Amino acid sequence: MRMNLFNDVKLMRHAFLILAHNEFQILRILLSMLDDERNDIYLHIDKKVVLGSLEQDLFRLAKARLFVLEQRLDVRWGDISVVKAELLLLETASMKGPYDYYHLLSGVDLPIKSQDYIHHFFEKNKGYEFVPYSCGEANLKDLERKVFKYHLFCRYYKI
């Protein structure tokens, strides 16, 4: 258990679950922005990535604990493999947890707020979950493209 030395209040623990497959220079920035003693980071790197091509300092953090999953899946857009990789991250984190919050990110997401702001927000709203949605015209077109059209054989797409 981690304790805040200033007021003996238990610090909230956050698990950041990251699916990465490309743009590793952005992943490096993401990891540095999440490098906080209150965070543990779980990283799934797509099986198609040659690990030897990644710089080893990508995996060095000063404060957060980083767990790079040994089991790597070949993840394809729109395929069940995305869900399997997400579940693998969640199962791995829950075995090392518990955590107050689990955050699922891609390796190209970046937070727009500081870790102090994020942690304060979740402390203030402990016990609440936030599920965003939007119903604008542009979002409706994107929804129609993803939901109402068939995407057969996603496993064989070359991106």
What residue spans do the PLM features occupy?
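ER/Golgi luminal nucleotide-sugar-dependent glycosyltransferases, focusing on the catalytic module
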Residues: M1-I159
